[in-house]
C-alpha cells in the first residue's frame, strides 16, 4: 500500500470541511489517557539497499526444515500446485460477492459444486459456503438451532475445541442464551468421549441443541448415533462440529445430526498463520430457511438454459437487519473454491486413500512416541491426533524437541488443568517416519513417567 502524506494545508482544508477547529477537537471524544501525545517510537528511515538487507536478514530467520506435530484445528496437508493456478485466475480472484448472476456464472457454479460436495461428505441435504471458519460455523449452528426450536438453553461437550467453545459462549451470552458444558469420560473404554450419562441427565425440554465435535479435540471419534438419540428424545437438535474435514474420508458421516459445522481448511487451504479458513454449515433440508450466509441454487434462464443464482439470502445485506439470520458477510467464495479444486483433484477415492494414510501415520506415531509416555484415551477410536502424557511438562519436552528442529505437540494444560502433563500430537500425510523416529529419540531421553 502506498503512503500518501498530507501537508499542513491539506489538514487545514480537511478540518474546515468537517467543521473542526483542530486535530485535538476532532479527537476530543477519545479520553486523554488513550491518546498518544508523543512521536511514535519507530526507527529511522532506511535507504533502498538497507531495506533489502533488513528483509533478507528477517527471511533468514524463517523456520525452514522443521518437522511439526501440531494440529488442533489447523492441519498441515499437501496443497497441489493446481489450486493456486486456478484461484489466481482473474475470473476468480476477487472479494466481490457474485450478486450479478448474468456475469458471475463461473463463480456461482463453483460455489454450487462446493455445496454439493459438502453434502455428499456430510450426509446432509443442504450446505452453504460463507462461514469464516469452524468456530464461527459452530456458533452460527447454535444460533440456528435456537431459532428453529424456540428454546434458549445449549449443551456443549467439554471435548469440543476450547476456542470453538469460547466463540460459541460469546455468541450465546450476548444474546441472553444459557450455555452449559458436559464433561468427557476420563478413564475406561470410552475415555475421551462425552459422558453420555451426564449428557442424558443434562438434556431437558428446554434444551435447544447439543453441540459435540467428532473427531473431538482429543482426536477421539464420538458415538454420534447414541448422542443423537439422547438429544432427539427431548426434542433438542444435534449439532456435530468437524474441525478436520479430511476425517470424513475414513469416518462414517454424522447422518444422525440435524446440523453439521465443518472446518474445511484441510481441503487445500494453507495454514497462513491462522486464516482465512473455510467454515461451512450443512443441515437437513427442513431447516433451509434458517441457514445463515449465502446459498447458491440451480435454475433456468428465460431461454431454458441451466444457470446458477444466489438464493434464500438471509444476510443483513439482503434483508432487514432484524430479520437476518447472520451478520457474517465476508465473501468466502475464493477459499471455498480452493476446497472445491482440492476435492476435485483427489476425488472420492483419493480423499478416502488420503484419510487412511493419515490414519496409518498417526497410528505409527502413537505407538512409537507412546513408548516414552502414556497414551491417554487409547481405548477409544481416533483419527490422526492423540494425547500423550509425559513425565516432563509439554513445555520441557517441546524445548528439547526444538533443539532438534521439531515442533512438538500442543500442551493441553491451558484448557484442561487435569491434563497438565499431556499434549495433543498430530500426524498427517506430510509427516514422515523419519520425523516420527527422531521425535521418539528425543522423548526417549526423558525421565520415566512412573517417576513423576
UniProtKB/Swiss-Prot annotation:
The Gene Ontology terms for molecular function here are: glycine dehydrogenase (decarboxylating) activity
The EC number of this protein is 1.4.4.2
Which reactions fall under this protein's catalytic activity? N(6)-[(R)-lipoyl]-L-lysyl-[glycine-cleavage complex H protein] + glycine + H(+) = N(6)-[(R)-S(8)-aminomethyldihydrolipoyl]-L-lysyl-[glycine-cleavage complex H protein] + CO2
The alphabetical list of record keywords is: Oxidoreductase
Q: Which CDD domains match?
A: GDC-P
Q: What class of enzyme is it?
A: oxidoreductase
Q: Does the keyword DNA repair apply?
A: no
From its record, what is one biological process in GO terms?
A: glycine decarboxylation via glycine cleavage system
Q: What does this protein do?
A: The glycine cleavage system catalyzes the degradation of glycine. The P protein binds the alpha-amino group of glycine through its pyridoxal phosphate cofactor; CO(2) is released and the remaining methylamine moiety is then transferred to the lipoamide cofactor of the H protein.
What family is it from? Belongs to the GcvP family. N-terminal subunit subfamily.
- Please give the subunit comment from the record: The glycine cleavage system is composed of four proteins: P, T, L and H. In this organism, the P 'protein' is a heterodimer of two subunits.
Q: Which HAMAP family match?
A: GcvPA
State the protein's name.
Probable glycine dehydrogenase (decarboxylating) subunit 1
> Coding gene?
gcvPA
Amino acid at each position: 500500500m502506498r503512503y500518501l502524506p498530507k501537508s499542513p494545508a491539506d489538514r487545514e482544508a480537511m478540518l474546515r470541511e468537517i467543521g473542526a477547529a483542530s486535530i485535538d477537537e476532532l479527537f476530543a471524544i477519545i479520553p486523554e489517557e488513550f491518546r498518544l501525545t508523543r512521536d511514535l517510537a519507530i526507527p529511522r528511515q532506511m535507504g533502498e539497499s538497507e531495506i533489502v538487507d533488513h528483509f533478507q536478514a528477517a527471511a533468514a530467520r524463517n523456520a525452514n526444515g522443521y518437522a511439526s506435530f501440531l494440529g488442533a484445528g489447523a492441519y498441515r496437508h499437501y496443497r497441489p500446485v493446481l489450486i493456486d493456478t486456478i484461484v489466481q485466475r482473474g475470473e476468480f480472484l476477487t472479494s466481490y460477492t457474485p450478486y450479478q448472476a448474468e456475469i458471475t456464472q463461473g463463480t456461482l457454479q463453483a460455489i454450487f459444486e462446493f455445496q454439493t460436495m459438502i453434502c455428499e461428505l456430510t450426509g446432509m441435504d443442504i450446505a452453504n459456503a460463507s462461514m469464516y471458519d469452524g468456530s464461527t460455523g459452530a456458533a452460527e449452528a447454535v444460533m440456528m438451532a435456537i431459532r428453529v426450536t424456540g428454546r434458549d438453553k445449549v449443551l456443549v461437550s467439554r471435548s469440543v475445541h476450547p476456542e470453538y467453545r469460547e466463540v460459541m459462549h460469546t455468541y450465546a451470552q450476548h444474546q441472553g442464551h444459557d450455555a452449559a458444558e458436559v464433561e468427557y469420560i476420563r478413564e475406561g473404554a470410552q475415555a475421551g468421549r462425552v459422558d453420555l450419562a451426564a449428557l442424558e441427565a443434562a438434556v431437558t425440554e428446554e434444551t435447544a441443541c447439543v453441540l459435540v465435535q467428532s473427531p473431538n479435540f482429543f482426536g477421539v471419534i464420538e458415538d454420534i448415533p447414541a448422542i443423537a438419540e439422547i438429544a432427539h428424545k427431548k426434542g433438542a437438535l444435534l449439532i456435530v462440529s468437524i474441525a478436520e474435514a479430511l476425517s470424513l474420508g475414513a469416518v462414517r458421516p454424522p447422518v444422525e445430526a440435524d446440523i453439521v459445522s465443518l472446518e474445511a481448511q484441510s481441503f487445500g487451504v494453507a495454514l497462513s498463520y491462522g486464516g482465512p479458513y473455510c467454515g461451512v454449515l450443512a443441515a437437513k433440508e427442513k431447516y433451509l430457511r434458517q441457514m445463515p450466509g449465502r446459498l447458491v441454487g440451480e435454475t433456468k434462464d428465460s431461454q431454458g438454459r441451466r444457470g446458477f443464482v444466489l438464493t434464500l439470502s438471509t444476510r443483513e445485506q439482503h434483508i432487514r437487519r432484524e430479520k437476518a439470520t447472520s451478520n457474517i458477510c465476508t465473501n468466502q467464495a475464493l477459499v471455498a473454491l480452493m476446497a472445491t479444486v482440492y476435492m476435485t483433484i483427489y476425488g472420492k477415492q483419493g480423499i478416502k486413500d488420503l484419510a487412511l494414510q493419515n490414519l496409518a501415520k498417526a497410528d505409527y506415531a502413537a505407538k512409537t512416541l507412546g513408548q516414552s509416555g502414556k497414551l491417554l484415551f487409547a481405548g477409544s477410536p481416533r483419527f490422526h491426533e492423540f494425547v500423550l502424557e509425559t513425565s516432563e511438562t509439554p513445555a520441557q519436552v517441546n524445548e528439547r524437541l526444538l533443539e532438534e528442529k521439531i515442533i512438538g505437540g500442543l500442551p493441553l494444560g491451558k484448557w484442561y488443568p487435569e491434563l497438565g502433563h499431556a499434549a495433543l500430537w498430530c500426524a498427517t500425510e506430510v509427516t514422515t517416519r523419519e520425523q516420527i523416529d527422531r521425535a521418539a529419540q528425543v522423548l526417549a531421553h526423558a525421565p520415566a513417567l512412573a517417576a513423576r
